[in-house]
């Protein structure tokens, strides 16, 4: 679907009809929705067992796929932010319903937009850079066991279990969890 979407690039024109624009937005939504579903599954699978090589592999594959798809549809985002004048942007946004605020928000970042090739590099580095480090950190720290006194008993728990106490509304419990 993302490959098919790439063909729209040649048809982008700030003077297009609202109907055409909404059809393009619908395609972007469909692609994003599908990626969210499969990415969500991979993320939940990984979150349920960060030590699982299978879940880690699936998560890595989905991150890579997400980056590839983002790179394929990136041109639309950049076109919207940098190549559509204010008058046409307002005209096109008028009939977008609940997406109007989102589209207006996107345009606020126009001055920070990089070239398409630079944005693609950033998308790719997100998968191999910080995301990879976070996964490695999770894999290492999720095998640690922590001892915490809860009531009259000392409990042994994982980092994830301890995090529940760190976020407690009770300040004394939070303090104990941090120690």
Which sequence ranges carry the predicted segments?
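A well-structured
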Residues: 1-179
């Amino acid at each position: 679907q993302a490959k098919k979407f790439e063909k729209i690039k040649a048809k982008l024109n700030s003077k297009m009809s609202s109907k055409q624009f909404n059809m393009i937005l619908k395609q972007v939504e469909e692609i994003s929705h599908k990626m969210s579903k499969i990415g969500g599954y991979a993320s939940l699978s990984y979150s349920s067992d960060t030590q699982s090589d299978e879940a880690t592999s699936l998560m890595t594959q989905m991150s890579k796929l997400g980056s590839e798809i983002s790179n394929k549809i990136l041109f639309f985002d950049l076109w919207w932010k940098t190549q559509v004048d204010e008058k046409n942007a307002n005209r096109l946004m008028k009939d977008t319903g609940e997406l109007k605020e989102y589209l207006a928000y996107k345009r606020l970042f126009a001055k920070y937009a990089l070239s398409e090739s630079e944005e693609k590099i950033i998308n790719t580095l997100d998968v191999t850079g910080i995301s990879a480090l976070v996964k490695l950190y999770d894999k290492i720290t999720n095998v640690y066991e922590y001892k915490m006194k809860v009531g009259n008993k000392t409990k042994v728990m994982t980092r994830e279990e301890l995090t529940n106490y760190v976020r407690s509304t009770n300040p004394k419990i939070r303090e104990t969890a941090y120690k």
